[in-house]
Amino acid sequence: MNQYHDLLERILSDGAEKHDRTGTGTLSIFGHQMRFNLASGFPMLTTKKLPLKSIVHELLWFLKGETNVRYLREHGVSIWDEWADANGDLGPVYGSQWRSWPAPDGRSIDQIANVVDMIGRSPDSRRLIVSAWNPADVDKMALPPCHCLFQFYVADGKLSCQLYQRSADVFLGVPFNIASYALLTMMVAQVTGLKPGDFVHSLGDAHLYLNHLDQARLQLTRPTRSLPTMTINPEVKSIFAFRYEDFKLENYDPHPHIKAEVAV
């Protein structure tokens, strides 16, 4: 995961200090891209331990189209609690936009079902896109989408994915996003009969919060280790049929967790 360490180093050396919505302050750069070959191992950070359970359940929650944290809490995942209202609702966030984008004529568009179908029918299409950024709904969301658009690409029997992330909390959020979209790419590849290719991560405002700088410097002192392997149950043939038990992360040997506060 040298790509991630290079990003940390670039922000620490070149970042501009900026004010932000949370009042915490950031060091920020604009425009950065990382590429991960999924055949070379699953891109899960090894220089600090990440919670696989939270990553997988959040992705399954998105794919269910849910926008209430009830499912997450039932599975011991609290990463969205800070933004939920008293009833656990978040407004029309990722799951709603992915699975039930409201069309002007009253229809509901299932972008995930559509893109999986299109990969099978028209793999060379340049329209294999899912967007979570709906300007009509942004003001209704507890937190507008940070990872807001992704595109699939098929070549030589392999499925690749590029994510555009408008706002990237590099210490806490980006490691989750890398693993989540790498896993999504593997899942979609399996159900469309393809092999995983690359995950390409394009960042807009990539920032370290000022209260994460010491943690980032600590992480950079740790040598990277071999990437783990992600095994997915080959019997699952629908993108909506995956369960937590269908994923097995093997040979994950990370350095210890590094605690940092979430900027809300």
Curated annotation (Swiss-Prot):
Pathway: Pyrimidine metabolism; dTTP biosynthesis. Its main location: cytoplasm. SUPFAM superfamilies: Thymidylate synthase/dCMP hydroxymethylase. (6R)-5,10-methylene-5,6,7,8-tetrahydrofolate binds at D169, A263. One of its GO terms (biological process) is dTTP biosynthetic process. GO terms for cellular component: cytosol. It holds the Pfam family Thymidylat_synt. Its EC number is 2.1.1.45. The active site is at C146 (nucleophile). It is found in: Cytoplasm. InterPro entries: Thymidate_synth/dCMP_Mease (IPR045097), Thymidate_synth/dCMP_Mease_dom (IPR023451), Thymidate_synth/dCMP_Mease_sf (IPR036926), Thymidylate_synthase (IPR000398), Thymidylate_synthase_AS (IPR020940). Gene3D superfamilies: Thymidylate synthase/dCMP hydroxymethylase domain (3.30.572.10). The keyword S-adenosyl-L-methionine does not apply. It comes from the Bacteria. It catalyses: dUMP + (6R)-5,10-methylene-5,6,7,8-tetrahydrofolate = 7,8-dihydrofolate + dTMP. DUMP binds at R21, R126, R127, R166, S167, A168, D169, N177, H207, L208, Y209. Keywords: Cytoplasm, Methyltransferase, Nucleotide biosynthesis, Transferase. One of its GO terms (molecular function) is thymidylate synthase activity. Belongs to the thymidylate synthase family. Bacterial-type ThyA subfamily. Catalyzes the reductive methylation of 2'-deoxyuridine-5'-monophosphate (dUMP) to 2'-deoxythymidine-5'-monophosphate (dTMP) while utilizing 5,10-methylenetetrahydrofolate (mTHF) as the methyl donor and reductant in the reaction, yielding dihydrofolate (DHF) as a by-product. This enzymatic reaction provides an intracellular de novo source of dTMP, an essential precursor for DNA biosynthesis. Homodimer. NCBIfam families: PRK01827.1-3, PRK01827.1-5, thym_sym. This is Thymidylate synthase. It comes from Nitrobacter hamburgensis (strain DSM 10229 / NCIMB 13809 / X14). The gene is thyA.
